[in-house]
């Protein structure tokens, strides 16, 4: 018998104050309860009703899912959710927003009573057995990351760390130029300057023109392209914002420290010697890629998180000359890299007051089942992915080849992630996948086995070179109260922009690094409210201990 469902734009109805008539299940399915789910849609999912993952959940939990689609756009989703909370009519039981809600919005919706607090349920193995089966350390990370400033947890999280994304400022040097000039790979900032001088003066690209760019990057890039950030980490840990003291007790502003000034002095010297391009601060992403891919290679050193900056990377002659190197050591032995600590994203919420609370909790907990999580992310087992030992035989990946893991856990065997499909919800929803699970997957959808000689297979090398290069104590994502957010709202916007601007000005000489210039900079930061930001951040950090 055909199943009857409704896929409705509930948010629009809520905005107009209209009611929505419930669906009467087919007679043969009357024993099944119906769960109303508001779900952020994906343009790449062609059908949610006749969808493999939908049917998997319905059959396993013996339920009917009634969909209310939220927009794919994050801003539109936030608007719709606010309208729903305001109208308080035709509410779903559960909501999945694909991480589109900000921490401030989650706290506000929880504080107002729209989202149900989840603390007691998450900590009860009888209510959420799958969640409580997560290894203790990972489960504690999830609980800590999702605890809001009021002490409550309102969202079920997706936990699926990938080391490649944690350290995107990977440094690449032109190895062909090093070889031509008889130079070794630099390991320190002083050695780098010597190499850059040789690049400048030795015509390593062989075109008879002094067109070589020593250090190049894209300061406006969001995925590792800001080379000056990478260089600063040879002097002090810089992650793009506030950080922690060495002992992990105090929130500090690294951009006010003496070591920061020393890093600026080093890069200003490179700039004055013609070894660091000022275009780092003015070029956009398109120009960045164009410079990296000139007919005659002209870049000596850059940083990038994605190899897509070199189109057709396996056959790209510019990339063929580059080699990824370790973060550089500074004069005091500092050797860090910008590091984005993994933060589990809040994905699913239960609407407070639902009369299907037990079912909603059962539904949420199912997403933390390992098999369900694999289907949620990769599709149908045996069709889109496999963990059959016979299929895994003879297969490997970069992490296994590097000896970091003994064997693969699964193979991806379809192009489901890049195709329009009705197999999954595109990984929208909570999920648990350990770091090992993520690192022991190989994408075999092309039918090509892992090639140990493929120069683009850098995941394991990046893991070894970059993942350990951060301080023991790293400032977590802070959860501010509504009052705290109001207090520092201006500082959160203006101060990071000002620091980036001054960084460029100090390096290019537009601002002086003498005592007068440095003190003027510190005074400006104070006038803009740095102390207020630090004090508020300290209070928020202390709540996490």
Give a label for each model feature:
Residues 6-9, 17, 21-171, 175-192, ...:
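Conserved N-terminal structural module of periplasmic/extracytoplasmic solute-binding proteins
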Residues 31-35, 61-66, 88-93, 113-116, ...:
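Loop/turn elements at helix/coil->beta-strand transitions in domains of secreted/extracellular proteins
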């Amino acid at each position: 018998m055909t199943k009857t469902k409704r896929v409705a734009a509930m948010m629009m109805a809520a905005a107009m104050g209209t009611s929505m008539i419930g669906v009467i299940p087919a007679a043969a399915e009357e024993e099944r309860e119906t769960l109303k789910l508001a779900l952020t849609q994906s343009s790449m999912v062609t059908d949610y009703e006749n969808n493999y993952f939908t049917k998997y959940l319905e059959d396993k939990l013996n339920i009917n899912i009634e969909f209310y689609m939220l927009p794919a756009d994050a801003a539109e989703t936030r608007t719709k959710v606010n309208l729903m909370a305001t109208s308080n009519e035709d509410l779903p039981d559960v909501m999945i927003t694909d991480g589109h809600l900000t921490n401030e919005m989650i706290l506000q919706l929880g504080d107002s009573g729209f989202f149900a607090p989840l603390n007691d349920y998450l900590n009860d193995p009888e209510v959420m057995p799958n969640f409580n089966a997560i290894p203790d350390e990972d489960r504690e990370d999830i609980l800590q990351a999702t605890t809001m400033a009021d002490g409550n947890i309102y969202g079920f999280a997706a936990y699926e760390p990938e080391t490649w994304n944690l350290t995107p400022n990977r440094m690449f040097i032109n190895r062909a130029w090093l070889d031509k000039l008889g130079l070794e790979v630099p390991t320190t900032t002083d050695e780098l300057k010597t190499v850059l001088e040789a690049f400048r003066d030795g015509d390593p690209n062989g075109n008879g023109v002094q067109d070589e760019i020593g250090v190049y990057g894209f300061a406006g890039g969001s995925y590792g392209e800001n080379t000056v950030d990478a260089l600063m980490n040879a002097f002090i840990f810089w992650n793009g914002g506030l950080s922690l003291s060495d002992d992990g007790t105090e929130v500090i502003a690294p951009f006010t420290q003496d070591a920061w000034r020393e890093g600026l002095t080093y890069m200003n010297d490179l700039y004055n010697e013609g070894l660091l391009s000022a275009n780092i601060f003015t070029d956009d992403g398109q120009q960045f890629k164009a410079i990296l891919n000139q007919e005659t290679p002209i870049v000596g050193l850059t940083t990038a998180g994605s190899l897509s900056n070199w189109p057709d990377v396996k056959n790209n002659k510019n990339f063929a000359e580059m080699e990824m190197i370790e973060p550089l050591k500074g004069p005091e032995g500092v050797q860090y890299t910008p590091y984005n600590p993994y933060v589990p994203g809040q994905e699913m919420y239960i609407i407070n007051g639902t009369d299907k609370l037990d079912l909603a909790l059962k539904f949420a907990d199912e997403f933390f089942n390992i098999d369900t999580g694999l289907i949620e992310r990769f599709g149908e087992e045996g069709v889109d992915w496999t963990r059959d030992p016979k299929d895994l035989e003879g297969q490997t990946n970069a992490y296994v080849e590097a000896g970091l893991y003994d064997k693969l856990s699964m193979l991806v065997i379809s192009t489901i992630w890049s195709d329009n499909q009705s197999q999954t919800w595109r990984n929208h929803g909570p999920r648990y996948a350990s770091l090992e699970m993520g690192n022991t997957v190989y994408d075999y959808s092309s039918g090509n086995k892992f090639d140990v000689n493929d120069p683009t297979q850098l995941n394991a090398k990046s893991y070894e070179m970059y993942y350990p290069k951060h301080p023991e104590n790293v400032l977590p994502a802070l959860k501010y109260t509504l009052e705290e957010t109001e207090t520092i709202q201006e500082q959160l916007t203006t101060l990071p922009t000002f620091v980036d601007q001054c960084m460029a000005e100090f390096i290019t000489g537009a601002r002086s690094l003498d005592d007068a210039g440095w003190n003027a900079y510190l005074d400006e930061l104070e006038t803009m409210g740095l102390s207020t930001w630090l004090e508020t951040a300290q209070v928020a950090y202390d709540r996490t201990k």
